[in-house]
Amino acid sequence: MALPLDFEKPLFELETKIDELRTFSQEKDLDFSSEIATLEQKAEELRKKIYRDLTPWQQAQLARHPDRPNTIEYIRLLFEEFYEMKGDRLYGDDPAIVGGIARFQGRPVTVIGHVKGKDTKENIYRNFGMPHPEGYRKALRLMRQAAKFSRPIICFIDTPGAYCGIGAEERGQAEAIARNLLEMAALPVPIISVIIGEGGSGGALALGVADRLLMLEHAVYSVASPESAASILFKDASLAPQAAAAMGITAERLKDLKLIDRIVPEPSGGAHRNPIGTAKELATALSEEIENLLALSAQELVDSRYAKYRNLGLHCIEDASCGTFEAEATDASGT
C-alpha cells in the first residue's frame, strides 16, 4: 500500500490504531470488541468527512493515487474474454494504451484505455500513462474495427497528457490526436468514455470524443495539470492548489458546466480503498448507457454526438454564472 496523502493521514493513523488493537486483542486473548467498534465508528465518520470536503487540489492528488485502479484492473473486474490487440500497423506498439475486444455482460465490445504503472518498473514501461502517437493510432485502428463489426466502444481515460518527447513529435503526435478527434466524431457505433483518474489535455481528449462522457467521483479533467497552469499563468508552480480551484477540474464542477454527462459515485474513501465496489458502480452506469445508446440508429448516434460537441460552451455563453479563470483564481488565492 502506498503512503497516505497528507489529508488522509488522520484517517490512516486511526485505522492503524484499530489494526494494532485488534492484533493485540487476538495475541493476548482479550476482549476489546466494544473499544474497536467505537474506533471503527469514528473512522467511518472521519472518512466520510474527509472525502466529502475535498478541495479541487486534493481531488487532483486523489486522482493520481498510486493505488487507484487502472484500466487493466477495470478490464479484469468488468469484462470477460478480453483479448488484447497490439500495434498501430504503422510504427509499433505503445504500452501506455491497452486495447482489445471483450464481452461486457455477454455483449461483444471494444475496450481501450490509458494505463499507468503500479510501481516504478511498470511506470517506466507504460511511460507513466503518457501515450506516443502509435498509441493513439492503435486506439483508432481498434475503433475502426469496432465500427466494422458494430461493436460498442468503451474507453478509459487516465493520463497526465500525451507524451511530448522529440520522437513523439517527429512521428506526428498532434496529427495522431487530431485524427482521433475527427474520426471518433463520425463512428457509427456507441462510444462511452470514462475518466477514471487524470484526464489531462489532448492526451485525454483523444479517447474522449464520445456519446457519453462519464467521470468517477474523484477523477479530474482539465486542459492542463494544476502545476502547469500555475507555472504558465502565475509563474509559480507552488500555486497549483489555487490553479486547481480556478480551473474547474472536478467532476461536480464539470457536470455543472455540462462538459461531462454523468458522475459515477465511488465508495467511501475513494476507488483505491474499494476497487470492487467502484467497479460495481461503473458496471451499472455502463450497462444503462449502452442500452440507451443501442436504441439509436447509426445516423442518430452520429447526429446526436455532433450536436453534443457543437453545443459545448453554449451553457457558459447563455449563463454568466460560469465565471472567469481570473476571478476564480483571485477568490482561491485571496489576493
From Swiss-Prot:
Single Gene Ontology BP annotation: malonyl-CoA biosynthetic process
Catalytic activity as recorded in UniProt: N(6)-carboxybiotinyl-L-lysyl-[protein] + acetyl-CoA = N(6)-biotinyl-L-lysyl-[protein] + malonyl-CoA
UniProt xrefs under Gene3D superfamilies: 2-enoyl-CoA Hydratase, Chain A, domain 1 (3.90.226.10)
Residue ranges annotated for the CoA carboxyltransferase C-terminal domain, each copy included: 38-292
Pfam families hit by this protein: ACCA (PF03255)
SUPFAM superfamilies: ClpP/crotonase (SSF52096)
Keyword RNA-binding in annotation: no
A GO term for molecular function: carboxyl- or carbamoyltransferase activity
EC identifiers of the protein: 2.1.3.15
Listed pathway(s): Lipid metabolism; malonyl-CoA biosynthesis; malonyl-CoA from acetyl-CoA: step 1/1
The entry's keywords: ATP-binding, Cytoplasm, Fatty acid biosynthesis, Fatty acid metabolism, Lipid biosynthesis, Lipid metabolism, Nucleotide-binding, Transferase
Subcellular location: Cytoplasm
Chief location of this protein within or outside the cell: cytoplasm
GO CC annotation terms, alphabetical: acetyl-CoA carboxylase complex
Subunit structure comment from the entry: Acetyl-CoA carboxylase is a heterohexamer composed of biotin carboxyl carrier protein (AccB), biotin carboxylase (AccC) and two subunits each of ACCase subunit alpha (AccA) and ACCase subunit beta (AccD).
Function description: Component of the acetyl coenzyme A carboxylase (ACC) complex. First, biotin carboxylase catalyzes the carboxylation of biotin on its carrier protein (BCCP) and then the CO(2) group is transferred by the carboxyltransferase to acetyl-CoA to form malonyl-CoA.
Family: Belongs to the AccA family.
Protein's UniProt name: Acetyl-coenzyme A carboxylase carboxyl transferase subunit alpha
Gene transcribed to yield this protein: accA
